[in-house]
Amino acid sequence: MNKLITSEHAENLPTVRIKKAILKDFKNVGYGEIIFNCGRQFVPYNTEADILGIYGQNGSGKTSFIEALSILQDLMAGAAVSGAYADCVAIGKKFSELEFIFDLQYKNGIIREATYSFCLSRKKLSEDEIHEKYKDAPDDFEIPDEDYKVVVFNERFSLIWENASKRQVIIDTSSKESPFIPTTKRKEIAGSGKKTLVSLEVNKQLAYEKSRSFIFMMETLQLFAENDNKTLFFQVLVELRLFARNYLF
């Protein structure tokens, strides 16, 4: 992570808080929305951490939310989501949708709002993938005939910043013809060279196969950094990645 953050950037890192979370067709939650009080008004920079509690009756979705946070942490930290979460898609649904809104407050008083959303489904493992997954299992372990992994797709990153009048989509991976859209933002963040375009396509496929985030995987962020590590969009991405790796849990 230090390779992605310059010394100048390190001097103005924000306090990051989750402001809102939306879960759709995730486990027993058809639609769930949580708004955190800490995001409703300005909290002075570098103040003590907020203490929030979630309460509700059995089956109200508390555990589902914690599991959604765990998935979020894995994705934003650039790690693979465990296959244990493959069963989180609601019964009878093809995929789940999760959305998280973040409040970023900086030392200089600037406040930005970032949104990261994605879809989650499950995919049956091939025989080779099953053998690879359980290659270190004890001899007496019974390897299952079938198993599943998590598939992450349709990632979307948008941002409201000090010079923007409204939320703007920065990265949308739902396109089949391009690694991500809008094209203007892709060229600004990653450059327009053919080699970069091929590398982005490879990363997108790798992320899909390995249950990772295309946006937050190190391979993608390094491409962005090589193009320009001082763009606002790149810096917010690495700030969110730092938050996930060190402060989310």
For the regions a protein language model found, what residue spans apply to each?
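Residues at beta-strand starts and edge strands
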Residues: R17, G30, K94-L98, R112-A114, ...
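Pre-Walker A-like glycine/lysine-rich segment at the N-terminus of P-loop NTPase domains
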Residues: N2-I71
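Electropositive, glycine-dotted interaction segments
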Residues: S121-F249
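Generic structural hydrophobic/aromatic packing signal, biased to beta-strands
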Residues: A21, I34, I54, L98-F100, ...
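Conserved P-loop NTP-binding catalytic core
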Residues: I66-D140
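Residue-level signal for short segments within beta-strands and strand-turn junctions
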Residues: D25, C38, L104, R122, ...
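Surface-exposed loop/turn and secondary-structure junction residues enriched for glycine/proline
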Residues: G32, D74, F224-N227
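Short, low-complexity, polar/charged sequence segments that are solvent-exposed and flexible
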Residues: G39-V43, Q73, F118-R122, E177-I181
